[in-house]
């Protein structure tokens, strides 16, 4: 999926808002390239939705639409004066009613590559590590068994 323009993005958000919330989206939405660990955010003081452009480029359409629906839940509840934060009951109920995700999946480009894998000899638990582990010094945290490199 290619990155839509600001006008196309606004039209997409308004269309999803009408489809799932039966209300128009009348405020601003734009891409924020500085977002790194989140799919999007709603700024209540400015009534602005910011979206991470990496999710358009690296994930599928359903994942990106889910992020927009999640942020629209924050938006519409804030406009109505209801609880719009993650822990509020109104927010959780609206997420469930619209089929919006609670969290977005991690970006493929942000996932770690583990160079070393160790397995406990006794319980079989697998540890993934970026750095090498001294197997004589460290043991399994679950059963205290010794480790072997896979």
From Swiss-Prot:
GO biological process, one term: response to stress
Family: Belongs to the SprT family.
NCBIfam families for this protein: PRK04351.1
Cofactor remark: Binds 1 zinc ion.
Keywords for the protein's UniProt record, in alphabetical order: Cytoplasm, Metal-binding, Zinc
Catalytic residues as annotated in Swiss-Prot or TrEMBL: 71
Protein name, UniProt field: Protein SprT-like
GO molecular function: zinc ion binding
Cofactor: Zn(2+)
Superkingdom of origin: Bacteria
Chief localization: cytoplasm
Organism whose genome encodes this protein: Oceanobacillus iheyensis (strain DSM 14371 / CIP 107618 / JCM 11309 / KCTC 3954 / HTE831)
């Amino acid at each position: 999926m290619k990155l839509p323009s600001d006008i196309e993005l606004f039209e997409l958000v308004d269309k999803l808002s009408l489809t799932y919330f039966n209300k128009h989206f009348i405020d601003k939405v734009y891409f924020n390239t500085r977002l790194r660990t989140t799919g999007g955010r709603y700024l209540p003081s400015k009534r602005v939705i910011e979206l991470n452009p990496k999710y358009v480029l690296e994930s599928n359409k359903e994942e990106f639409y889910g992020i927009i629906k999640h942020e629209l839940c924050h938006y519409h509840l804030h406009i109505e004066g209801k609880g719009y934060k993650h822990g509020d009951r109104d927010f959780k109920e609206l997420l469930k009613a619209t089929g919006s995700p609670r969290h977005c999946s991690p970006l493929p480009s942000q996932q770690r590559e583990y160079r070393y894998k160790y397995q406990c000899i006794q319980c079989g638990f697998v540890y993934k590590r970026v750095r090498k582990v001294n197997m004589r010094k460290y043991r399994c945290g679950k059963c205290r068994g010794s480790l072997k490199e896979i």
